[in-house]
Amino acid sequence: MYAITVGPIQENCYFLIGDHENDTIIFDPGEQAEDIIAAIEENALHPIAIVLTHAHYDHIGALETIREKYDIPVYQNPIEREWLLDPQLNGSARNPNVPDVRLAKEADVFFEEMGPYEIGEFRFEMQHIPGHSPGSTVFIFRENGFAIVGDVIFKGSVGRSDLPGGSHETLIEGIQKYIVTLPGETVLFPGHGDPTTVREEIYSNPYLNGATR
């Protein structure tokens, strides 16, 4: 796993690197396409896909540039299929601090069912955890002991639920069902901020231990 932080609100773009010829899945290319391309070239990576945890503007800003340069498919939860096309839905038209709206073509592949999935050599499990956004999806790599969780959960916090389509109760229910039940040593890679573990969040995250509702 390799990551760079991009954009004004410091979004984490992840590069999941395989064993076969540096095949790489890019998760959430949020901004600064030139920096993402530089990371790919400097590390001799071979992109094979872009995967979105969700389609808020800060996670999709470099999507179209990267897709076109490397001619690779974009994978997405179909609940948010219109969000790449609509700056009102992805939030870029509603945020006065975003100078340009974020637009992209429709995704190439939609995750029609949650559960086990494969892209090339990569095997993982998907779970739908709405609440921050309607289509938020986490990607669990059980064999490798980590999960890419987007803006569902952070170190010491959880995703915003005051955005359109958000629900704090639904978000916490999903985290309790799909995140808290993972092995404690599972590393969580969030959309913003530092990695954490399931165990650390169970014991210290105020949104999970009842201190904050």
Question: Where does each model-flagged region fall?
Answer:
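A generic "binding-loop/recognition-motif" signal
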Residues: I9-Q10, Q32, H56, E80, ...
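Active-site HxH/HxHxD metal-binding segment of metal-dependent hydrolases
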Residues: Q32-P116, F122, Y203-A211
